[in-house]
Amino acid sequence: MYSPAWVKDAIFYQIFPDRFCRSERYKAVGKFVPWGSKPTRENMFGGNLAGIEDKLEYIKGLGVNAIYLCPIFKSNSNHRYHTVDYFEIDPVLGTLEDFDRLVKKVHKLGMRIILDGVFNHCSRGFFQFNSLMELGPNSPYVDWFHVKGWPLNAYSGKPNYECWWNFPALPKFNTNCADVREYLFSVAEYWTRRGIDGWRLDVPNEIDDDSFWQEFRRRVKEINPEAYIVGEIWDAPERWLQGDQFDGVMNYVFRKAVMQYLFDENAISTEEFCKRLQAAFPEGRGDMPMNLLGSHDTTRLKSQPCTSWERIKFALTLMFFMPGAPCVYYGEELGMLGGKDPDNRRSVPWEKLPEMQKEPVYTLVKELTAMRNGNPVLRDGKMEIACDGESFTVTRTLGKKKMTLAVSLAENEPQFEIR
């Protein structure tokens, strides 16, 4: 299968917009909690697109060359996975002009930017769903959702319509409806034409229809053949990687193996880890995964059970050594703490930046981005894993060039070297 050429050279940085940076250049109407407050599922910090633009030089300075933005469309939630309007930037974040300026500056700095597409479900505030609540079965949008009874029970008791994981705030689209499909495809086309470099697709497996994603791919690639389409798939991804749907997946299979080997009290063996590592990067598949150790859905590295500096150091080094595009979750380079959602979505303490840049992980991330950017073998080379008891090697080979990560467990702490 073909993946966009630029992705093999990409190092992604994931941003949760509400918590990244709040610039005073943009004044949103509304009341926000003080920056640095404890995150909850409901509170809003007021991070904005201008704040992201203000920090692009910082991001570029890490050695990163691609940004993955969590949802930015109009929504009534801090994470914005409850979409109200797919064609409008959330006014808390900024304006369409702010978005265009951000994309332009990202590209001027030689970086790429992909957006989060939430196409399985929307918000109760979505216009067409509101029409059903007002007009019932007489709504012209009655076929847009999976309704089981009238009137809609959207705010009390058990919902009588299909919704994501039975959350009434997230009504599920009926993607068998031609009008729904066309609407969602037009969303993808609109933002692709505005200059983004691809899509991260939220829970795409919930749209259990290959033809939907095949058409999605065709529409996006017709506008930008080099757009990167990456799906949030937590388990075996082969179905989605036949060359006609996604270019890659978020490599949660890799992440799970690393967590169970390094950060679990009941750790798997080195032999089992090597098997799982190989399974996460099968030879000959040809896709371009997004490799990650943390995201807005997971506990941060520094807050994991059994965490230690040596384990974090090895985990990050391994991620940058593997095929695919590594992705750093915002603040991971600063050693930010964070347990389960919503604690893993804390605001970046920019006022403490000089102090936090002294964290060894900050230096490590810059060293790893430099290593990957400076060695084509880590971006294009074939991979081989060899296991011997409690030791193993990962070797990348490109022509006559070879790099090897040699690892052993000494007193349960990973010891490794690159040669």
Model-derived features with residue positions:
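N-terminal structural segment of carbohydrate-active enzymes
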Residues: 1-115, 120-122, 127-131, 166
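Loop/helix patches that line or flank the sugar-binding groove of alpha-linked glycan CAZymes
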Residues: 3-9, 23-45, 240, 257, ...
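Aromatic- and acidic-residue-enriched segments that line the glycan-binding/catalytic groove
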Residues: 4, 8, 28-32, 78-90, ...
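Conserved, mostly hydrophobic/aromatic
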Residues: 15, 59, 69, 86, ...
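The substrate-binding groove and active-site-proximal loops of carbohydrate-active enzymes
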Residues: 36-50, 82-96, 166-181, 197-207, ...
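Active-site-proximal helices and loops of the catalytic beta/alpha 8
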Residues: 103-109, 121, 126, 130-137, ...
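Active-site-adjacent "subsite" loops/lids of carbohydrate-active enzymes
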Residues: 123, 127-194, 202-204
